[in-house]
């Protein structure tokens, strides 16, 4: 099983290293024969001798083309002859490529920006994470004394925790009498002990939570200050930091550094991404949070160190559990796109699609288009096109609602209509599909590059799902599920990739044709559905909600199932409408904002959720009760009464302060904030008192009654004293409770001012319930 690949240099020559796990043992394979190359398209082949003479300089050394070879390729499906230009070292490519491109005889150069080790994996057909080797995992976490505003890495690391299958341990340099704590003499010895632990346990995968931007950069900084090395790599190298967009990424040679933070940010949508919040969202278990100022106080006074050690141990344990949960999916994505987990886990879906396409292009002898330069990128960003069809919803409270949607609408359109850059407006074509409204033509004489790959992916997914049904082995079933989910992620990203401004296979015409066909098919379903006696309540891109006013639930379900069968007989190719479900009751506020309840009593909302941390508990609680009154009891009047009661209690200061706390996260050093919001103002006041505030810290505050801006009246929850302080009732009514429910009750004719306890407006349910 290939874990990773890179290259080293010996005597000026590159040597590919393949890090592998084989029969339970780690090994490294070397290849000294692979050479870097780029492609050049010439105006006239006779100019190749001139091109061969092009030289450049790199670190005082002359860079030259070592060999040339004429090759037959395809470019967007059309035959093309290009020259393959070999160089001595991968770093020669950036040194010489612009000189080659600028030569008068050169039309353009291609595939000059594919990293050498990744090029090797593609060309040799090697796939990381293939095989059944059992990998070993170790989670690592650190606790520091880091003061906001001070130099990064100035404060010491006070604890390092680690966890694996054997359990979790903490290393520290102050005496703590706990069975899982190991005490050493100094911070220096603690870091050296971590190195020893990693070398002894020799994990294949090191799991962290934000290790790219905090744990490892901090460890490296402290090791440097203390004059010690951090040889964590299997080749005894130190962790290597590199820029990746706005963030850092840390690589450990011979091991997979699996940072959960970017993976979880890409995979799930949460109001906050603290380790505690993620753990609760995934496993439904709570974990105590110990704040930075509490850690500092415990370390300085010696009181409460056991609590900090337990917190540190749990950090490592939770990171390990989360790592084991998320790693298999990233491993399957790595197998699918053919690049290492380290890269895949830090990639956007657009980049995952691109690596997959680069590999498949090589297999099919296709020359990959170049990435856009800055000017072309800016031009693409300015381009726009019409998206999916969204129908304004029918207002009111509805009963007996069916949900119908297309199975993989956009991938199905791409395959059915052969939507691809190489089929677009193709000359000498016998059969075309013409996109409605936009008029772009796609050749049907041959399968397009991207539609054929997408078709293979969807076919493979169906086979995997079939095997899952047949399999009786739970382990195999789980692995197959990870595989089919990885395919789904990739398949659903192709439409977005066509419109991704940085894409090699960017195709605005393809993207707008896909949405045009999407609008046509959903409109066809709408018209046919209305002809069948249904009332369409809401449409959004690939799905819709409908009912038959006055009909019984079973009749609505039965007719909907018959309709699905009928419409699918009329739809072309892979297009297929599915019966998604039945809802007892629901209402639609505006586009992408609605709430439904199924027959089991489960409430489903979209666009109405106030899950962000900057909503107080009282706002969330009131909204939940309002939804329950409307959907479970069918009683809008009851919902209004609930809001009035809450606003009355707020006005009379009868709501406990813990329900008024607003949480916001500090996302950057305090000195970098230009706009001072309430959470920043509170954080600055805490920092002035010696509390260690750092990026990632969540600030909880309550807004007090008084004059002046909110930022001056916000107080940290820890400092709020009910005997001394009064919360600002008007702020919580106008900026928390009413906005949370107004968007719902507006659908039933209520305005914000109608919902306060001192103002009333009687509107009965009968005016809104449809029969």
UniProtKB/Swiss-Prot annotation:
Its EC number is 2.7.7.7. This is DNA polymerase 1. Changing residue 263 to A: In strain: ST 855. Changing residue 391 to N: In strain: ST 855. The lineage of its organism: Archaea, Methanobacteriati, Methanobacteriota, Thermococci, Thermococcales. Belongs to the DNA polymerase type-B family. GO terms for molecular function: DNA binding; DNA-directed DNA polymerase activity; nucleotide binding. Changing residue 359 to T: In strain: ST 855. Changing residue 320 to S: In strain: ST 855. InterPro entries: DNA-dir_DNA_pol_B, DNA-dir_DNA_pol_B_CS, DNA-dir_DNA_pol_B_exonuc, DNA-dir_DNA_pol_B_multi_dom, DNA/RNA_pol_sf, DNA_pol_B_thumb, DNA_pol_palm_dom_sf, DNA_pol_type-B. The gene is polI. Pfam families: DNA_pol_B (PF00136), DNA_pol_B_exo1 (PF03104). NCBIfam families: pol2. One of its GO terms (biological process) is DNA-templated DNA replication. It catalyses: DNA(n) + a 2'-deoxyribonucleoside 5'-triphosphate = DNA(n+1) + diphosphate. Changing residue 532 to R: In strain: ST 855. Keywords: DNA replication, DNA-binding, DNA-directed DNA polymerase, Nucleotidyltransferase, Transferase.
